[in-house]
């Protein structure tokens, strides 16, 4: 038998890719059927770090394929002084995920997915102008817009909670995600979502 026949295969089984080397995407469930195509969390989108440097803004709807943790990380880079500091926000998200796991014992990816499902408004109101008068009309919100707005509300809530507070932004982000995943009204995102839906209901 020659050495070629006994050699080990060049590519072994691909290792299970885990976020930050810890969190697996295998057991993450997306319970809202309308958002399954817009929350990119399956094995296909698994990354070690939420930093793929992909061109997701180049084409319409392509950002739906951006891994959901990376979208959260990108949204945390807000308010002038933090623009472009992606390594800082990656570190914040990593710490927040560790805190979530300590407090809940669950996979932080599942907590994030539940928080996004719970904090995306399903109904909103838009301005409609008729003959010089402007009135508001209730409209349904598309799935991609729901995900976008949920991420924005979660990040805004964490940022505002951490401002002039002894708690770090990682702790505030962890609290915001845990409360939103439970559907608790202590969450900024849940409060804002309820407010938007209440205004839309009054404008039906």
From Swiss-Prot:
InterPro entries: Ribosomal_uS7, Ribosomal_uS7_CS, Ribosomal_uS7_dom, Ribosomal_uS7_dom_sf, Ribosomal_uS7_euk/arc. It comes from Homo sapiens. GO terms for molecular function: mRNA binding; RNA binding; rRNA binding; structural constituent of ribosome. The keyword tRNA processing does not apply. The modification N-acetylthreonine is found at residue 2. The gene is RPS5. GO terms for biological process: cytoplasmic translation; regulation of translational fidelity; ribosomal small subunit assembly; ribosomal small subunit biogenesis; translation; translational initiation. CDD domains: uS7_Eukaryote. This is Small ribosomal subunit protein uS7. It is found in: Cytoplasm; Nucleus, Nucleolus. The modification Phosphoserine is found at residue 142. The modification Phosphothreonine is found at residue 14. Keywords: Acetylation, Cytoplasm, Isopeptide bond, Nucleus, Phosphoprotein, Ribonucleoprotein, Ribosomal protein, Ubl conjugation. There is a cross-link at residue 47 (Glycyl lysine isopeptide (Lys-Gly) (interchain with G-Cter in SUMO2)). Belongs to the universal ribosomal protein uS7 family. It comes from the Eukaryota.
């Amino acid at each position: 038998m020659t050495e070629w026949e006994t050699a080990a295969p060049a590519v072994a089984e691909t290792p299970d890719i885990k976020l930050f080397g810890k969190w697996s995407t295998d057991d993450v469930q997306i319970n809202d059927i309308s958002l399954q195509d817009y929350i990119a969390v399956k094995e296909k989108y698994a990354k070690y770090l939420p930093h793929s440097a992909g061109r997701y803004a180049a084409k319409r709807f392509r950002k739906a394929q951006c891994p959901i943790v990376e979208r959260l990380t990108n949204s945390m880079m807000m308010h002038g002084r933090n623009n472009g500091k992606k390594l800082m926000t990656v570190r914040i998200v990593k710490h927040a995920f560790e805190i979530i796991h300590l407090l809940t014992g669950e996979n932080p990816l599942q907590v994030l997915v539940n928080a996004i499902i719970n904090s995306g408004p399903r109904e909103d109101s838009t301005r409609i102008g008729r003959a010089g008068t402007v009135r508001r009309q209730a409209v349904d919100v598309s799935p991609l817009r729901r995900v976008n707005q949920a991420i924005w509300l979660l990040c805004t809530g964490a940022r505002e909670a951490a401002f002039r507070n002894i708690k770090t932004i990682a702790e505030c982000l962890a609290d915001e995600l845990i409360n939103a995943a439970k559907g608790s009204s202590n969450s900024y995102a849940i409060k804002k979502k309820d407010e938007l839906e209440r205004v839309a209901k009054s404008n039906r």
